[in-house]
């Protein structure tokens, strides 16, 4: 393992206070985290001395210097200083969404020409390999990722934070966090962005050019299962930040332990044997098998009679659940059920509603179907 040092720039930010906000549900730990922080607020001589000391103290760990310039000269200087400090690798950050200059951060990351150019500048200024950190604030990440590779990047990192407004103060009528009555659009991270991150990792791995270079995955990683999902979609190494801010470095030990147990249970000897194993199973919507439906079954012993499945199906699906108000027991109407599994996902009782009978739309059909497994990991 190793560390990615907080992004270093020639520009030293004057940070606002407060600068964090969260999105949560019903008092649970936050699922989303908004930050209005920019690059490192320390002088560069301090930053590079930290990198130098880290490499001295942990010579067998990978130390990555993350840099962000606003001009050719700045990218070149930061790359050279990173190498002098003893970093093993350089990450070019083209993706921070809350920079105060349009010449830095995600504004650059949305411009493939600038991404390519700055990668050329950085890579020509150092012998160290560079990777380009992509912004998710666009439609097709493959375009700037290809540009980065053309510019000399040896790998891609994805994703950085998503532009957001998490909450509003409805009394002051402004966003949060509130800074003297105002707020700003800024980066969103945490578990809530994992689906977005996984989608971009999949997109990159389906690109014939980008998939040939290593991908560093990040965005919503909290557990060992999250780690596995990124690895299976093609990320060969991972970054974790927001979860460490929430739970501390100890969660990394849990991640390593969980992955190790999974590998032992499945007889997997090398972590690399996991990487990319799910890529081929992510296909276009038109390639999905639509010849059958999977009905659901309700365990009447586990059912608590809350009626949530009935309400959701009646108001937002196909009215395929009948509810006995006297006994508070729901029943599936198999003729109406389309197998959408909305009820399964709203049920608050674990394993109360589960996949049931497979029904082919053409009654003469009986081809083999791969179904979701139910085991201790799911």
Model-derived features with residue positions:
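Iron-sulfur cluster-binding cysteine motifs and their immediate structural context
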Residues: 308-326, 342-360
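Alpha/beta enzyme core
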Residues: 2, 68-216, 222-237, 284, ...
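Short secondary-structure boundary segments
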Residues: 6-8, 94, 160, 242-243
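C-terminal helical cap(s) of enzyme catalytic domains, especially alpha/beta-barrels
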Residues: 13-29, 165-185, 231, 243-268, ...
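Short linker/helix segments within small regulatory modules
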Residues: 324-335
């Amino acid at each position: 393992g190793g560390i990615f040092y907080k992004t270093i720039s020639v520009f030293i930010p004057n940070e606002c206070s407060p600068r964090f906000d969260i999105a949560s549900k019903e008092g649970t730990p936050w699922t989303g985290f908004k930050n209005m922080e920019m690059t490192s607020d320390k002088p560069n001589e301090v930053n590079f001395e930290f990198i130098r000391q880290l490499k001295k103290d942990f010579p067998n760990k990978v130390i990555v210097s993350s840099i962000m310039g606003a001009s050719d000269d700045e990218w070149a200087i930061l790359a050279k200083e990173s190498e002098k400090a003893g970093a093993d690798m350089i990450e070019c950050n083209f993706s921070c969404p809350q920079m105060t200059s349009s010449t830095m951060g995600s504004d650059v990351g949305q411009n493939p020409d600038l991404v390519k150019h700055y990668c050329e500048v950085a890579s020509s200024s150092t012998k160290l390999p560079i990777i380009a950190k992509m912004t998710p604030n666009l439609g097709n990440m493959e375009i700037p990722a290809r540009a980065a590779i053309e510019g000399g990047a040896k790998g891609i990192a994805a994703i950085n934070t998503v532009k957001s407004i998490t909450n509003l103060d409805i009394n002051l009528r402004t966003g949060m966090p509130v800074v003297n009555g105002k707020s700003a659009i800024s980066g969103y991270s945490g578990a809530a962005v994992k689906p977005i991150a996984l989608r971009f990792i999949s997109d990159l791995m389906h690109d014939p050019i980008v998939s040939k270079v290593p991908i560093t995955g990040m965005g919503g990683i909290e557990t060992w299962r999250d780690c596995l999902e990124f690895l299976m979609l093609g990320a060969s190494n991972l970054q974790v930040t927001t979860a460490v801010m929430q739970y501390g470095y100890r969660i990394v030990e849990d991640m390593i332990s969980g992955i190790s147990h999974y590998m032992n249970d499945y007889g997997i000897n090398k972590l690399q044997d996991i990487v990319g194993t799910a890529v081929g199973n992510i296909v276009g919507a038109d390639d999905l098998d639509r010849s059958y439906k999977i009905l659901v079954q309700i365990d009447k012993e586990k059912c608590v009679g809350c009626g949530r499945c009935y309400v959701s199906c009646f108001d937002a699906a196909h009215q395929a659940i009948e509810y006995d108000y006297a006994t508070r027991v729901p029943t599936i109407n198999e003729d109406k059920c389309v197998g959408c599994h909305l009820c399964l996902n709203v049920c608050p009782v674990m394993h109360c509603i589960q996949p049931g009978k497979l029904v082919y739309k053409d009654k003469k059909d009986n081809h083999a179907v791969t179904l979701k497994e139910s085991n201790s990991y799911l």
